[in-house]
Structure formats: C-alpha cells, structure tokens
Swiss-Prot record:
Gene: glgB
Chain segments annotated as coiled-coil in the UniProt record: none
Protein name: 1,4-alpha-glucan branching enzyme GlgB
Pathway terms, separated by semicolons: Glycan biosynthesis; glycogen biosynthesis
The species this protein was found in: Yersinia pseudotuberculosis serotype O:1b (strain IP 31758)
NCBIfam families xref list: branching_enzym (TIGR01515), PRK05402.1 (NF003811), PRK12313.1 (NF008967)
Keyword Glycosyltransferase appears in the UniProt entry: yes
Pfam families, per the entry: Alpha-amylase (PF00128), Alpha-amylase_C (PF02806), CBM_48 (PF02922), GlgB_N (PF22019)
Matches recorded under InterPro entries: A-amylase/branching_C, Branching_enzy, GlgB, GlgB_N, GlgB_N_E_set_prok, Glyco_hydro_13_cat_dom, Glyco_hydro_13_N, Glyco_hydro_b
C-alpha cells in the first residue's frame, strides 16, 4: 500500500490552495521505494510509463475522486524518466509530467534578479518556448513573493488553476513551472491566490504578445532574435548629426477608407516608410506601441510593456516594420512610459495582494492626474523589470532610441500634488531619489551595452543635468525636449504681428539656456489636442497670413540650434486638432497648388536643406556654432542669426514676423562674400508672395551691427530666408 500524503494536504492541493506542489506531485524516493503522485482531474485511468522503453510500469490508483492518483514502486529505488498514459473519457494520451522536472532558474539568475541588475530579465521571467531534458514545452516564471499559490492557466488546461500549480523559489519570490507540450500561440495567465486568500487572474508582466483588447490574456510567443545595430544607425543618433523626427501615432496616421480600420504594421511599413523618406526626416518617433487596454490613452497607459500591441499585428510584423525603416536609412524612436501604469485588474496592481509593483502609500503610488499607479522604484525587481524592458526594445527589435515620457512626474515626489499630499524623501526633499537612481542606471546600462542607442527625456522643469553623464551627477539622457522654447515661441507666434514687438524676447530667450542641455525642439502631439488647436489655427490673421506665419515659424525653427521634432499632420498644416480615432486629413493635399501642399513642400525642403548644410546641425550644442546678427529689432520684429560648422561654413537665417516687406534692410555679417538664397519660405513654390533676393546677393563693405561687412536685403512679409556664404 502506498503511504498517502496527509489528507489535509491532499484537500488543499485539489482545492488549489497548496503552495508547495512539488513536495507531493511527481516522483519521490522514499524508504519504501519510489512514490509517484499526480493530480489529473477528469482522468479515468493513469499508467506510469518508462520513457526509455515505452513500457508500462504500474497503474496509478485513484485515491480521491477529484483526480488525485498515486502509485508506490517498492522494487524501484532510483528515479527515472517517465510519462503518464492517461485515458480521458475513453481517449488515450501520453503526457509528460511537469512535476518530474527540477528547478529552472540558475543560482546566478536568482541572485541577479533579486539584486535588480539582471541585464535581460526577460530571458528568465515570463513564458519561454524551450526543450527541457529533450521534451518540448514552455517554461513559466512570475514574481509574486507574497502569494499563497500561483498556477499557470490557459487553453491547455481549461483555465483550471488546480491543474498546474507552480514551484516557489523562496530565495527570490519567483514561481516557476515547465509545462511539456505547450506551443506558441496558446493563451495563458497566472492564477494567483494572494496573501489575503483572494483569487486573482493576472496577465504575464513579461509576455511577448497579448490578446487584442478588450480580451486580456497573454499569448505564448517566442523571444525575438537579437537585432544588431550598425555604424550608420549609431552615427545618425550622434549629437553632431542632423536629427529631424517625425512623430507618429500608428492608429491614426492613415486608416482604411472603407471601414476606418487601422493599417497593419506591414501596411504601415509599405506606406509610412516611403512617406517619411520622401519628406526627408531622419527619424520616426512612435507613440507607445506597448500593449495598452484603453485606446484613448494613445498608448501612454501601458500594461504589456514587453508586447507590441496587437492592434496592428504580431511581434514579427512589428519587427519587420522597424527593419523596413532601417533599410530606408531611417532610425526608429519609441515613446516609452516607465512612470506609471493603469490599475486594470488583470495588470500589475496589487499583483500578489500587496502593492508589489507600485508604492503602497497613495501619496507616493497614485497619480491623481491620470488615475494611474506609480512604479515603486525602490524595489530591485521593479527597477529590473523596467530597465530590462528598455534594453529589450533596443536589443530584440532594433529600436534606436527611447523617448521617456513625463520624466518630471517621476523625479519629483510633489509633482502635481498640493501640500500634505506627498511624502518627502529620506533627506526631507521633494526629489524622488529612487526614480533618479533608476534613470541613471538605465541610461548608463544602455550606453554601455548598446553603444550608439540613445535616450530622450520629456522633462518639463529646470532639473539640472538631464543630459549630463550619471558619473558627474546628471541623469544620463542624450537629449532633452525643450518645452520652454516651444511654449515661448508658440506664444509669440499667436500674437498679432502688430503686438509682437512687445514680446520680442520670447523668440530670443531660448538662446540664454540653449547650451545647458542637449535640446530637441518639439512640436509634439501634446500641442494639437485638448482645445489647444492645431499649430496652423494658432497663427493669427486671415488664411494667407496663417499659412505665411506657419511657414516662417517652421523655417525659423529648422535654423535654430537644437534637433527637430514635428508631429504628424503638422507637416501639411492640418487645420483641426488631432483625433486618434480617425485618419489625418490627407484630402487637404489633393490640390497640388494649395496652401497645404505648399507647407508640405516647405517642410520637405527644410529637411533636405537641414541635412545638406552642416552649419544647421553640426554645432547644435557648441556656442561657437551660433551668433546673433540682429537680436534687438523689436520694432520691425526681425531676427537674424548665423549658424556655423566645424569647418567654418556659415549659413544665415533671417525672419520677418510682420506682414510688411522690409526693403533695403541692412544686416551686418562677420565675413564678406556672395550669399546664395538657399531657402525662402515666401517662395511661390510654397504658395507665398515670391518676394526675395533673386537667388543671392553680394555683401558690401559697410559697417553694420558691429561688423565690417553687411548685406542689403529684401525681407519678404511673414517669412524666413536662408543665405549660404559661398567660398
């Protein structure tokens, strides 16, 4: 007779409340020989089969009608490889027992995961297709240290949490199990009995693929292969290279005209890549494509950080989409959100019954602006989950850069909080020291492990050293969005031209701090939503003046120090605000001679001009690359400045922000010579009035603006011109 486990243990195991299934299930060496136990609800008959020869060794006895089987092999003392021959409702099946396999995580992995320094936690946690002891299947692992029991549930076991409880690795709180015979494409979740005894059904935080909303299950999917970077892609991210970014929301750039449905990743690869290349942008920036439950969040409330959203296709489709951009010589930036996550029940919130991924105190862990939860950056495992995710997108999909969203909300404990609604740090300050340490670690890791890949911060305050290296006290980002420049210049452009002279400093103030960080000048999605109106609609005047103002502003921006970013639709002056539920208004370009087509041609030429002339980008972050020529002509609302590259080539940008043409306008210049007009935003080609300097002009030896040489120019109304000094 077999020695039965304690009846209470059997009851707990069958009811799904026993936390150590490997101590009962599987094959165990006892003083009376080998004992084999199995929990197979609904099985009618179970035989033990020796894998090596296929011989049936013994029939297991049904000790509990709820599916608990046991066999005692008194003549066998040493464990051996085995299978079960199971009869289900008269259907025979040979299965491998998940409980015959040993621990999965290696000691080094356990140590690194607990320490929070595992470079690739996604290689160990989550669901992984593999062969173990020659048996194909999937290894599952999930961090839930306070859970009483965790099971894998899915299509393969009727979503029954009793059937496949997992092994707890007590040294790190990770539950693991290898399930033989499971294949890619099957649905799964983790059924967790939390520390309070409540049952929770959770999606896999490390899932590589997830169901399309509103469904919430994870999909078993292979870990994507490594994508190597290239010298060309690395150079394209450099501070001395031209960086012109086209920001895109994949779900609304263009849609199917017959049903308003999204384009797939592969359809976008065919259409978007060609368009971005035609327009001359060097980079494309994608609003978050991590899996997210709510369309209206635009992806900024992600739950599946490791899964490209199923809205547009599979991970393989997304990988092909990125590769298509790389083939076209365009780098890909991904908006990344490590600052907060939604509180959906199937997600990370109270994962094991405790505030595991989030701060427990709502003054730290709840984001009242967005009704989301804030990651607990003080936990090693949470930092590892996030930092590993950043590296994952770069290593496994070839993402060239990450733009980190809402950095200010991460690094300040009092962000958008009134007095008494936040918790000071250890020193009594307002900085979130844990978040700062996390950002420094992540940026430094990317710099070391993925050379040439960069990070960009959307940071809206004056926090010092955002783009300084962590070793000297900085956050370690490569670039920072210049929100101040964007707000100031847009406020200026919204003024009626007659009043602009009173706000002249709004256009010049940015140069006072332009070299404190490595800035990107952003006209992003945030500026064309929530009643702010489109960029075009903010411009004053009648239709002609609105378009002229916009063209002049874009040309001013492209000449100004700092890399460029433009949200989709702005490149052809879409008149309405962005709507994530519909396509851009491409019909505005039907008239090739219309104003919208003119703006599109201008942006295309600005990009090509920007990439062609090194003075416009090479010394973006060197004071020697910029010089004001006319900075104080507020009466005429004229600005003139010079851009210079490392070899001494010079390009002059002059803007007239009034509708009054300025004839015989003299501008002092450092060097005399012939200056060719390489761009004029008032050109008839862009639907302007076609006033200019007839292609070029020679300087005069006439002193002006503290220079010995000068140019006598015609400044078109509401326009910006570029003049290139020819050797």
């Amino acid at each position: 007779m077999p020695v039965l486990p304690d009846r209470q243990v059997i009851n707990q195991l069958i009811s799904g409340h026993y936390g150590d299934p490997f101590s009962i299930l599987g094959m165990h060496e006892t003083s009376q020989g080998l004992q084999v136990c199995a929990l197979l609800p609904d099985a009618q008959e179970v035989w033990l089969v020796e894998t090596e020869n296929g011989r049936r060794i013994a029939q297991l006895t049904l000790e509990d009608p709820r599916g608990f089987f046991i066999a005692q092999l008194t003549r066998r003392k040493k464990s051996f490889r085995y299978q079960f021959a199971v009869t289900w409702q008269e259907n025979p099946q040979i299965i491998d027992d998940p409980y015959r396999f040993g621990p999965l995580l290696q000691d080094i992995d356990s140590w690194l995961l607990a320490e929070g320094t595992h470079l690739r936690p996604y290689e160990r946690l989550g669901a992984h297709l593999m062969r173990l002891d020659g048996v194909p299947g999937v290894s599952f692992a999930v961090w839930a240290p306070n859970a009483q029991r965790v099971s894998v549930v899915g299509d393969f076991n009727f979503w029954d949490g009793r059937r496949h409880p997992m092994r707890l690795r007590r040294e790190n709180g990770i539950w693991e199990l290898f399930l033989p015979g499971i294949e890619a494409g099957q649905l799964y979740k983790f059924e967790i009995i939390d520390c309070h005894g409540q049952v929770r059904l959770k999606a896999d935080p490390y899932a590589f693929e997830a169901q399309m909303r509103p469904e919430t299950a994870s999909l078993i999917s292979p870990l994507p292969d490594v994508v190597k970077s290239s010298a060309a892609r690395q150079k394209a991210n450099d501070l001395c290279s031209p960086v012109s970014i086209y920001e895109v929301h994949l779900g609304s750039w263009r849609r199917h005209t017959d049903n308003n449905f999204w384009l797939s990743y592969r359809e976008l690869a065919d259409q978007l890549v060609e368009y971005v290349k035609y327009m001359g942008f060097t980079h494309v920036e994608l609003l978050p494509i991590n899996e997210h439950p709510f369309d209206g969040s635009w992806g900024y409330q992600p739950l599946g950080l490791y899964a490209p959203t199923r809205r547009y296709g599979t991970p393989e489709d997304f990988k092909a989409f990125v590769a298509k951009f790389h083939q076209a010589g365009i780098n890909v930036i991904l908006d990344w959100v490590p600052g907060h996550f939604p509180s959906d029940e199937h997600g990370l919130s109270t994962f094991d019954g405790t505030a595991l991924y989030e701060y427990a105190d709502p003054r730290e862990g709840y984001h009242q602006d967005w009704n989301t939860l804030i990651y607990n950056y003080g936990r090693n495992e949470v930092r590892n989950y996030l930092a590993g995710n950043a590296f994952y997108w770069m290593e496994r999909f070839g993402i060239d850069a990450l733009r980190i969203d809402a950095v200010a909300s991460m690094i300040y404990r009092d962000y958008s909080r009134a007095e008494g609604q936040w918790v000071p740090n250890y020193y009594g300050g307002r900085e979130n020291l844990e978040a700062i340490a996390f950002l420094r670690y992540t940026n430094k890791t990317i710099g070391v492990e993925r050379p040439g890949s960069v990070t960009m911060a959307e940071e809206s305050t004056d926090f010092p050293g955002v783009t300084l290296p962590p070793d000297i006290g900085g956050l370690g980002f490569n670039y920072k969005w210049n929100m101040g420049w964007m707000h100031d210049t847009l406020n200026y452009m919204q003024c009626d031209p007659v009043h602009r002279k009173y706000h002249h400093n709004l256009m010049t103030f940015g140069m006072l701090y332009a070299y404190t960080e490595n800035f990107i000048l952003p006209l992003s999605h945030d500026e064309v939503v929530h009643g702010k109106r489109s960029i075009l609609d903010r411009m004053p005047g009648d239709a002609w003046q609105k378009f002229a103002n916009l063209r002049a502003y874009y040309a001013f921006m492209w000449a100004h120090p700092g890399k460029k970013l433009l949200f989709m639709g702005c490149e052809f002056a879409q008149g309405r605000e962005w709507n994530f539920e519909t396509s851009l208004d491409w019909h505005l370009l039907d008239d090739e001679n219309g104003w919208h087509s003119g703006v599109q041609r201008l942006v295309r030429d600005l990009n090509h001009c920007y990439r062609q002339y090194a003075p416009l980008y090479e010394w973006d972050y060197q004071p020697a690359g910029f010089e004001w020529l006319v900075v104080d002509d507020h009466e005429n609302s004229v600005f003139a400045f010079l851009r210079r590259d490392a070899e001494g080539h010079e390009l002059i940008a002059i803007s007239n922000f009034t509708p009054v043409p300025r004839y015989h306008y003299r501008v002092g210049i450092p060097q005399g010579g012939h200056y060719r007009e390489v761009l004029n935003s008032d050109s008839a080609f862009y639907c302007g009035s076609n006033l200019g300097n007839q292609g070029g002009i020679d300087s005069h030896h006439v002193r002006s603006h503290n220079h010995e040489h000068s140019l006598l120019l015609t400044l078109p109304p509401l326009a910006t011109i570029y003049l290139l000094r020819e050797n």
